[in-house]
Structures are given as C-alpha cells and as structure tokens.
Amino acid sequence: MNGDLYQELKKRISGEVRFDKVSRFLYSTDASIYEIEPIGVVIPRTHEDVFAVMEITRDFGVPLLPRGAGTSLAGQTVGEAVVVDMSKYLNRVLEVNTEERWALVEPGVVQEQLNLHLKPMGYLFGPDTSTANRATLGGMMGNNSAGSHSIVYGKTIDHVLETHVVLASGEQRVFKDMSFEEAAQMSGIEGRISDIVANNREEIDRRFPRIQRRVSGYNLDEFVRGKKFNLSKLIVGSEGTLAAVHQARVRIEPRPAAVALCVIHFKELVESIRATDIILPFNPSAIELVDDLILSLARGSLELSRQMDFIDGTPAAILLVEFYGENEAELRSKIESLEAALKREKFGYSYVRAFDAAEQTRIWKLRKAGLGLLLGMKGERKPIAFVEDCAVEPSKLAKFLVRFQEVIAKYDTTAGYYGHASVGCLHIRPLINTKSRREIQVMKDMTDDITDLVLEFNGSMSGEHGDGLARSHLNERLFGHQIYKAFQDVKLAFDPHSRMNPGKIVNGPPMTENLRYGEKYSTVFVNTHYDFSREGGLATAVELCNGAAVCRKQNEGTMCPSYMVTKEDEHSTRGRANYMREILSGKTGIEEFSGQKLHDALDLCLECKGCKAECPSNVDMAKLKYEFLAHYNEAHGTPLRSKLFAGIHNLSRIASIWPAMANTMMARPIVRQALDKYLGIDARRKLPPIAPQTFESWFRKRSRPPKATTANPAGKVILFHDTFIDFNYPEIGKATTTLLEAAGYEVAISERQCCGRPMISKGLPEEARANAAFNVGKLAPFVEQGYSIVGCEPSCILTFRDEYPDLLKGHAVDAVAKASFLLEEFIVREKKEGRWKLDLKRQTTKALIHGHCHEKALIGSRFLKETMALAYTVEEIDSGCCGMAGSFGFEKEHYDISMAIGQRRLFPAVEKQPDAIVVAPGVSCRQQVEHATGRKALHPAEALVLAL
C-alpha cells in the first residue's frame, strides 16, 4: 500500500514526497525521549498541497501528523503516520494589520522571524519560548506554548484569533469567534462541541485547575470560562490530533518601550522560589529560574562560558527578574525598590543589573540554553523530560518544590531545575538512564508519585510542554473518567477515524513504549582514528544530540550554515547526528558508516565547528565528519581531488620553485576549465597566487636563528608560518613579524610541516597524525624554553589545540597545545599581563571584522574585536560562516551553496559600507569576500601594521 500511496502523493503534490529510509529516520525523533519511524514525509509547497495530502491519506486510510520544527519535548511530533512538514515552504507572514493588531501567518513561520518582521512596526507576538529561533507558529499552536513572559502575555491560546484548518475528512474550515447561542444551533462540529460542553459544564469547571499554566487535555475550560465560542480554542493545544492548520490570524502586542533585568543570586534553590512571593507584587515581566547544575554545565560550554561574567560567585540558583517600563529611570526605580525589599527579608546575596539590550540578550542566552546543556551531560543518566513540566499556583510553588525533591530523593537520583517561577511552572528534570530496565521502572513509578503530588496541589502535569507520548496516558487520572470521556468525544467529533496524530491526548500508549534509548538499545563498536574519550566514545559523541534543534536557527551565529540555506533537516547537525545514531545502533548495517548515503548527508557540512560551540550539548559534527571520511576513504579509496587539496602544502612548495610560470598557468582559462572538468575545481574561482618569494626565505635572510635562552622568556615567539603565509601571502607573515618586533618580542620560525588541517578535512587522519607528530617534535623544545607559538591562520593554529590532542598523546602535545595562540588572542593576553606596551595610532577608517568560524567556535571573536579596537573603530559583522570553508567553496558541486551562504549576511554587509576596511583572519574568508564582492579583505596584522 505504501508504494501506491507514495505514487499518488507524488502525482498530486507540487512539494516534496519522501518515503526513503533516511528521511524516515530523520523524522522518527523530535526533542523528546521517543522514536517512531513514520510511514513517509510530505513537505507541502502550497496550501493546495496540504489539502491534497489530507484527501489522499483519507482515501488510503492512513494516519497523518502535522509537524513544524520538531522541537516537541513530549513526543508530540513522532508517530507511525505520514508526517507533513510545514516548516520549509509554508513560512510566510501574509498580512499585518497594526490598527487592529493582528498578523495573518502560515504555520511554518518561525516565532523569531515573525517578531523580526513586526519589530519595525513596534509590535511583537507575545508568547516567547526558549526555542523562539526555530519553533514555528504552527507548532506553538499545536502545543499551546507559552514561554518566559507568560505572566504578561499568557499562552498561545490567548493570541490566536482565527484558524484556517483542514479536517481529517478533507473539509476546509475557518474557526473564529461566534456566540454560544449560534454554535448551539449549528449541526456538525460546532453543535457537537456545544453539546459536549453543556453536558459536562459543572465537571469541567470542577476538574480543570484554576492556574495560568495548564495545557494538558483539550481546552474545554475555554468554553465554560470564556466569553466567545471559537473552535480555534480547541485546535490550539490539540497537538495536531483534530485538524491541520494551514493559516492563522494571531494577535500582536506593542513592544515595551524599555526593558531591564536584575539577576538575583541565591545560596539555596528553595530560597530562590520563596523569593518569588516578594518579587511578584512588583509586577515583573518575567521571573526565570536557573539552577547550579545548569550554571556548572554552562561553564563547560565553549560559547556560554565566555558570556558568564554576570555570575557572582557560585550560586545554588539565580532568578532572572525582568521589568518593562517607559524609560530607564522608571526601571532603575523598580529594581532599586525590589532589591531593597529582598534585602530586608534577607533573600539573595548579589543583584546584578542589566539595562543594555546586548547584555540582556547574553543573559537570556544562558537561560534558553538550559535544556540543551542538561541533555549534553556526560554519562548514561540524563535529565530527561517526563515530569519536567508541572505547574501549580505560584504561592504554592516553594512547598511543591520541597515535596518534589523528596520524591526525587526517594528514587536515589538528582535533577536539573529551571523554568518560569513567575507562573509556578518549573522544569524539573530527574536524571534517568532509559537504557536500564530498572530505571525505566523508576521513571514510571516516579511519574505516578508526581501525578499524585500534582493532584494534591491542584496543579497540572503540563504547564506548556504538552501531553504527547509522555503524559497522554495520565489524562484520565488527572481529569477523571467523565472529562476524559468528553475528550474522547471531542476527538471523535473532529476525527471519527482517529487518523490525526493518533495516540496523543487520548488513547495514549504507556509512557515507556517507543523510547529512543530503551533497555534493548545498543551500539556497534567502531575502531576510530580520532580519540573520542573526551566525549565518552564515538556513539556517545553522536548521542549528545538530543533533538533540541538549535541547529535550525536562521538569523544569528554560525551553526548551521548548510541548514540556513537548504532548510533541510538532513543538512542540520540534528539530522546528521540522527542518521549516524541509526547506523551505530545497528538499525542499518554498520557498513553504512562508510557508505554513500551518510556521505551525502555529511557532504554539505562545512566543518565550521559552529555546533561544537553553539549547540548547548556541544555536538562536534566536524569531528564526526572527519571520522566518517576516514572510514569512507578506506572503503572506497581517496578521490584524487581530495588528495590534491590535502597535499596543498607540497603542491605549493613545488609551485614556488617557478612562481611566475605557476601563476601564468593557473590564470589560463584552458587550465581552469580543465581543472573544472576533470577535477571539479570550479573555474569561477580564482586560485591563490604563488608569491615570488616565500615568507620563510624572506625571514631567514633577514634574521638569525633563535637563541636557546633570553632574558625575557615571555617575549619570545615562534611564528607558525602556515602554507598560505609561506607560499601565497607572505605579506601577512611580514606584517606579523614587524608588529611583534615593534612591540619588543623576539620572533623566530621553526622547521615545520603543514598543520594537517587539509588532511583532516579530507579524511586522511594518518597523514595528519604524521604531520602533527613532526610539528610537535619541532615545537615542544621551544615551548620548554618559554616560547609562545603564534599563528595567523585560525584553522591552522587552532588545530594544535583542538585536533592534535585527538591524534597524539603525551606531555609534548599538551604543552604545544597550551602554548599556541592566534595572533589577536596573543596580543590581548599579553596586553592583559602588562607585557604588550605598543601604542598604535588611531585610524579614522572603520574596520568591519569577520571572524573565522573556528576562531568564533573555539576562542570567540572578542580577541579580534579587542585587538582591532587598539587602532580602529570596530564593527563586527554578524555574518556566520562565509561559505568558503577551505576547499569546500572551490569544489564545483558546492560553489552555489558556498555563495548562497555568504550572500545571506556577509556579502551585503561588506557591500553596504564601501568606505570601511574589511578585516578577516581566515584566508578562506578573505578569498570569499574578494571573489563575491571584488573587495580585498585584510588580515588583522596587515591592518594593525598600518597604524604603527
């Protein structure tokens, strides 16, 4: 049947229809602990496609599951159904009416995209989940999402005015406000829902908790306590079980005039919750909890650790308390009054204020990363989502927390704590190993205990994360038999054959079925070329991906450049990790780990390392790709082009013997066309020139070899002259030498080989290991003599720190890694230590700076900013990846996507400011800027030497 279904869908749908094994793998998980392989995937391009897929699945009698970004935490978006992915094409803001304060949107619109669209108009969409940079409006409606500011804006249900839906029958409907009397007179769904409400009115009023945060079950309370009859109130929070939304009208709110944050530090977790009783009367716009477990994990995150200077000491918990106001003076007054009240009652030990928008964004980033940080914990026990979304009346929250902790202690485990203290909804995640039969039983027993506790406190098992596979089985117990029967009647009214996302909200399976990592889960051993002990092994490195989908963000940072252009989950970090996990768990043959399908999935990975820093779980897809390519080359042979790119150092060395001839040859159209045709090196790319004199030749003719000792060890530098500095751009090495010597440093060079980066990138780890061993052997003695190793090319010098320890072991490699610095990092370090005393002349020209991906991931861009600020007014381009990525952009099959990545943000920013100089440490970045815009970008050393 599936073959006929596939053919019918292909025939009638203009979008994409995918029933292949890889696509089914990619959509078998979300951000929950569950995994169910779907029948197939449809990606509608138009509204008509949505109508057609509903009709076709109806005719074939198969289930259907609407899906957005797949960030659901309770398993709402996985199931044995045809998954309809609304996120790729149906993502337009169709209309905005600021006078009437509404926006008409398609379901795939990302929350952050909508707010960016509304920002110039002075409006926003109120509910703001921590997944705002990838969660879709359709998903938020399905889940009835809320977020950090629900104390002001409520839940999504409070902002949906009208829904355009398709029912399981294929019927198209528009649901909007009408009177209860009108609904009661209607036949069809309106009349049936009116009858259900009338027959259960008293029980609904009695059994639904009177708290702001309750999304469990169907929203029948809206028809008892609400003023209008609107079936959109049932669609919202229905998790796709009633209908598919293809368009919606949502309310928008005026943006606050001014915003401020106060970060309150506490010595005890419970103390922080008790403090909310004092904070709430000051009318904050948010009160968010972050516990010490998340803070400690953040300190181990490459990106977040660089942004935690607002944390004072080692608190057991912090509260982020936010206020809206008309101006900063009003906000200062509010915060001062709050601090005085807290101090009177002896709550908190430190109060950090943030009035600057950039500083607030930095602080909020920590809170939003809480989920991913927790799931990135090492070890088999993970702080998983199953009882993580309980909500009670805020005044009862402290007592509820203490009782919850008693339950956790009963089962001999711990938990991570974060969430929305303002509205009594805490995300408490007990650590459970779902690969253990005993702990799966613990998960079930603990759920029973917590359900009893929630009922005792008249709360909700879900304040915003929904029922899904994790909690649907609890709804009869939570609401009673009569209301549960009413829920089943609602389902029948909309979907009599139970085709819409079955098994959610009603008739749910046991919570311990369909676990992604269950007691039978195991992995196949793979003998690796790189050391994965830091990650806990290859399989564990893959399993770090929890599905939170931060890699689907589109408007900021580096991760994930290929997804930002393709909008394909397959080309996101999550998609690639999912497929690797399927292979390593034995669901396909292990030969797939060196197979073509995985090669295709990894092909567009630029090895930028953005995920290593920006993924809260620190998934290092670049390293995983290096490992895969090594196995792929072993199985299939290394392509000639890969060998040539990997051997760029030796090729350049040979070309440098006859530089003029080499340049003439490379410039000839016939040669470039031949490279294009036979090697796939795109003829549209300009190959780097061979310099008339190598940097090493220049350097050795103008200096003596370094002495073994010196009076000032801190002032001795080995300049690692990488391949491009030596053979292509010696002016950068000359500028670096001039700059360092002007600052009083003794500069020397050492015998060396290529850093190994090109070999690593092309899947040749043994060749890279040999080069690493040679370089460490030559450089370690200098380190012992007090030399610092300074490099100009981020991807080269940072290889010493990131990859060498995975290729080699021993004191020498650790010492070399510790002593290696990027030029701008070295300058900032030396200045901080008081050793850099060189004064540079202020320049009138602005410097637009673009950091290299590896630099931004491994050390951050602040060193580049601080160094360039010594002489220039600096503006950092939030440009993400430039798209070149070493040889990637030179490869014919990658040229278009390479340019598309750069065109997203980098190229327009460069072209917008023709009077500014462009500064980029990475050779690939400078090449990309020149090829795309015609402008020559400078290395930081070249720009700084102009200011001597």
Q: PLM features: residue spans?
A:
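N-terminal glycine-rich flavin-associated loop
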Residues: 9, 32-64, 82, 86-129, ...
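Iron-sulfur cluster-binding electron-transfer modules in prokaryotic oxidoreductases
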Residues: 495, 502, 517, 622-948
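C-terminal substrate-binding/cap subdomain adjacent to the FAD-binding core in PCMH-type
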Residues: 32, 140-142, 150-153, 160-366, ...
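Long hydrophobic segments that form regular secondary structure
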Residues: 223-242, 249, 255, 260, ...
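A glycine-rich phosphate-binding loop feature that marks nucleotide/adenosyl-phosphate handling sites
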Residues: 23-26, 72-75, 131-137, 212-219, ...
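Terminal amphipathic helices with adjacent charged low-complexity linkers/tails
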Residues: 248-250, 282-381, 415, 419-421, ...
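Ferredoxin-type iron-sulfur electron-transfer modules and their immediate structural context
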Residues: 381, 456-461, 468-604, 627-637, ...
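N-terminal flexible segment immediately upstream of the FAD-binding catalytic core
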Residues: 1-59, 69-101, 130, 153, ...
